């Protein structure tokens, strides 16, 4: 007899917001979501700031969200850990950072600093760059080159000049540091093996020829003149800088989120790299703020804190069969991040990865691969052996990042169609679903004055539990979702999971 599965369905980037203006969630025609919302118990939970282990007021993101969801507790994020280490001075005593600096001193070479130059707090924070500059100054370094990746996604689309000016003021204050190259994150921080993009950023960083400007500011302004926003600024070299990354140098990459920093780091450190032809660099000391992936051969500044008893491990320990399913853009989130930074499958776990469409930007294909994800899930459900399903629909977030309202509405409408088929199938099997999100985004695609808003929001996310006869607590946080799943599965919650089920007892 087929099992009665319990599913967690994450509508990525889908949050509650009262105002309809620029709110794709409110404006979309979503009969299935609305039907479940009126029929079943609902609540809303917090998905940002202190509730997910981030600094107060900091918007949540997919990595942080899935980690909190899977862990069933508040997980203190890299950003919070690094800020704390700077505040209490441990940062300046860090062995890996000091080893990088000593390597430069020994070789009379250059320290290169890579990273996303913004205060978005999703992948990086530029104040961490300032702390690195303080450390380099304290240690007497003279040559520090900054290779800046521009954001325009987790912050305003054209905000780079503000960060560039503040960084140049820091260079001036300390008497060290200069911009060496600048690339939009579209090039330097790809995660889908689009090596043609990464190669352009790599060539600028190595100073292998290409567009040159006399200053970072001039280069950004020239890109603005071509109607390019920060994310899409074409990699360029800053004139003063004429050395690039060379033998005997050191690199510190200060992004703390792994998924968009791994590919560039592989190019510099993986001797087996085959994406395009690279010139090996001898005696390069390469350090990354966190572990990016197994192909990156680097020293780690902040080692991972191990999370035990995540939802996947508890399911395994109780002999349950689980499925993780998403398209490429969110597959690491339902696997690696939801398992607390673990790549290996648990016993009884299987995975379905559906390729994301190969388009330049997802507003060109708002449905992305939602229908294929839905079809694959129905196929898996028909096997009748699943206890637990962890599913992510990427569209509201990925299309929401375009800052375009109509495509984002279409994205949500496509997901709603898929949601209906999936939830109805689970219900028909006698199972239950929790429909929720990991953070906001599509709830505010336009600002009040109709400018594109490409960032996440700090709004609470909805929760629907498709089970009759229960009521839900009035509030909670993402870390309460795993305990709620275990509650539906009639599985005891381990002590490590300090979240609380949203179901009233």
Swiss-Prot record:
<feature type="binding site">
    <location>
        <position position="401"/>
    </location>
    <ligand>
        <name>Mn(2+) 1</name>
    </ligand>
</feature>
<dbReference type="Pfam" id="PF06415">
    <property type="entry name" value="iPGM_N"/>
</dbReference>
<feature type="binding site">
    <location>
        <position position="330"/>
    </location>
    <ligand>
        <name>substrate</name>
    </ligand>
</feature>
<comment type="function">
    <text>Catalyzes the interconversion of 2-phosphoglycerate and 3-phosphoglycerate.</text>
</comment>
<feature type="binding site">
    <location>
        <position position="456"/>
    </location>
    <ligand>
        <name>Mn(2+) 1</name>
    </ligand>
</feature>
<feature type="binding site">
    <location>
        <position position="397"/>
    </location>
    <ligand>
        <name>Mn(2+) 1</name>
    </ligand>
</feature>
<feature type="binding site">
    <location>
        <position position="62"/>
    </location>
    <ligand>
        <name>Mn(2+) 2</name>
    </ligand>
</feature>
<feature type="binding site">
    <location>
        <begin position="153"/>
        <end position="154"/>
    </location>
    <ligand>
        <name>substrate</name>
    </ligand>
</feature>
<feature type="binding site">
    <location>
        <position position="191"/>
    </location>
    <ligand>
        <name>substrate</name>
    </ligand>
</feature>
<keyword id="KW-0413">Isomerase</keyword>
<feature type="binding site">
    <location>
        <position position="185"/>
    </location>
    <ligand>
        <name>substrate</name>
    </ligand>
</feature>
<keyword id="KW-0479">Metal-binding</keyword>
<feature type="binding site">
    <location>
        <position position="12"/>
    </location>
    <ligand>
        <name>Mn(2+) 2</name>
    </ligand>
</feature>
<comment type="subunit">
    <text>Monomer.</text>
</comment>
<dbReference type="GO" id="GO:0004619">
    <property type="term" value="F:phosphoglycerate mutase activity"/>
</dbReference>
<dbReference type="Pfam" id="PF01676">
    <property type="entry name" value="Metalloenzyme"/>
</dbReference>
<feature type="binding site">
    <location>
        <position position="439"/>
    </location>
    <ligand>
        <name>Mn(2+) 2</name>
    </ligand>
</feature>
<keyword id="KW-0324">Glycolysis</keyword>
<dbReference type="InterPro" id="IPR017850">
    <property type="entry name" value="Alkaline_phosphatase_core_sf"/>
</dbReference>
<comment type="similarity">
    <text>Belongs to the BPG-independent phosphoglycerate mutase family.</text>
</comment>
<feature type="binding site">
    <location>
        <position position="438"/>
    </location>
    <ligand>
        <name>Mn(2+) 2</name>
    </ligand>
</feature>
<feature type="active site" description="Phosphoserine intermediate">
    <location>
        <position position="62"/>
    </location>
</feature>
<comment type="pathway">
    <text>Carbohydrate degradation; glycolysis; pyruvate from D-glyceraldehyde 3-phosphate: step 3/5.</text>
</comment>
<feature type="binding site">
    <location>
        <begin position="257"/>
        <end position="260"/>
    </location>
    <ligand>
        <name>substrate</name>
    </ligand>
</feature>
<dbReference type="GO" id="GO:0006007">
    <property type="term" value="P:glucose catabolic process"/>
</dbReference>
<keyword id="KW-0464">Manganese</keyword>
<dbReference type="GO" id="GO:0005829">
    <property type="term" value="C:cytosol"/>
</dbReference>
<feature type="binding site">
    <location>
        <position position="123"/>
    </location>
    <ligand>
        <name>substrate</name>
    </ligand>
</feature>
<dbReference type="InterPro" id="IPR011258">
    <property type="entry name" value="BPG-indep_PGM_N"/>
</dbReference>
<protein>
    <recommendedName>
        <fullName>2,3-bisphosphoglycerate-independent phosphoglycerate mutase</fullName>
        <ecNumber>5.4.2.12</ecNumber>
    </recommendedName>
</protein>
<dbReference type="InterPro" id="IPR006124">
    <property type="entry name" value="Metalloenzyme"/>
</dbReference>
<dbReference type="GO" id="GO:0006096">
    <property type="term" value="P:glycolytic process"/>
</dbReference>
<dbReference type="InterPro" id="IPR036646">
    <property type="entry name" value="PGAM_B_sf"/>
</dbReference>
<dbReference type="InterPro" id="IPR005995">
    <property type="entry name" value="Pgm_bpd_ind"/>
</dbReference>
<dbReference type="GO" id="GO:0030145">
    <property type="term" value="F:manganese ion binding"/>
</dbReference>
């Amino acid at each position: 007899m087929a099992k009665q599965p319990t599913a967690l369905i994450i509508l990525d980037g889908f949050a509650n917001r009262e105002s309809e203006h620029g709110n794709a969630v409110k404006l979309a025609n979503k009969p299935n979501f609305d039907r479940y919302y009126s029929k079943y118990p609902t609540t809303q939970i917090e998905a940002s700031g202190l509730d997910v282990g981030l600094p107060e007021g900091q918007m949540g993101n997919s990595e942080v969200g899935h980690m909190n969801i899977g862990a069933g507790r508040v997980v203190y994020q890299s950003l919070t850990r690094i800020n704390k280490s700077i505040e209490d001075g441990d940062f300046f005593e860090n062995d890996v950072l000091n080893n990088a600096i000593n390597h430069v001193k020994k070789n009379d070479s250059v320290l290169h600093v890579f990273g996303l130059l913004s205060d978005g707090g999703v992948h990086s924070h530029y104040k961490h760059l300032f702390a690195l500059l303080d450390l380099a100054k304290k240690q007497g370094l003279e040559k520090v080159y900054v290779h800046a990746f521009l954001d325009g996604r987790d912050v305003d689309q054209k905000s780079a000049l503000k960060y560039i000016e503040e960084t140049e003021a820091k260079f001036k204050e300390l008497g060290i540091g200069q911009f060496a190259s600048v690339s939009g994150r579209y090039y330097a921080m790809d995660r889908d093996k689009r090596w043609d993009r990464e190669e352009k950023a790599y060539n600028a960083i190595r100073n292998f020829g290409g567009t040159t400007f006399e200053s970072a500011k001039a280069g950004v302004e020239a890109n603005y003149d071509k109607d390019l926003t920060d994310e899409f600024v074409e990699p360029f070299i800053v004139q003063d800088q004429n050395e690039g990354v060379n033998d005997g140098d050191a690199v510190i990459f200060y992004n703390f989120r792994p998924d968009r920093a791994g590919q560039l780091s592989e190019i510099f450190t993986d001797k087996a790299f085959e994406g395009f032809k690279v010139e090996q660099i001898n005696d390069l000391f390469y350090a990354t703020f966190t572990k990016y992936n197994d192909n990156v051969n680097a020293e780690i500044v902040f080692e991972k804190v191990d999370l035990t008893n995540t939802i996947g491990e508890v399911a395994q320990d109780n002999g349950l069969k689980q499925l993780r399913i998403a398209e490429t853009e969110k597959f690491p989130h339902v696997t690696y991040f939801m398992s607390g930074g673990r790549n290996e499958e648990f016993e009884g776990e299987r995975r379905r990865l559906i390729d994301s469409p190969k388009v330049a930007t997802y507003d060109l294909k708002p449905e992305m691969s939602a229908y294929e994800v839905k079809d694959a899930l129905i196929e898996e459900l028909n096997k009748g052996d699943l206890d637990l399903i962890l599913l992510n629909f990427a569209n509201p977030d990925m299309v929401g990042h375009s800052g375009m309202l109509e495509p984002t509405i279409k994205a949500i409408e496509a997901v709603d169609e898929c949601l209906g088929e999936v939830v109805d199938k689970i219900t028909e099997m006698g199972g239950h679903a929790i429909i929720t999100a990991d953070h906001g985004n599509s709830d505010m695609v336009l600002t009040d004055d109709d400018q594109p808003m490409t960032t996440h929001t700090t709004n609470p996310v909805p929760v629907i539990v498709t089970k009759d006869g229960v009521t839900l607590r009035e509030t909670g946080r993402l870390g309460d979702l795993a305990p709620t799943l275990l509650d539906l599965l009639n599985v005891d919650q381990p002590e490590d999971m300090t979240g609380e089920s949203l179901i009233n007892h």
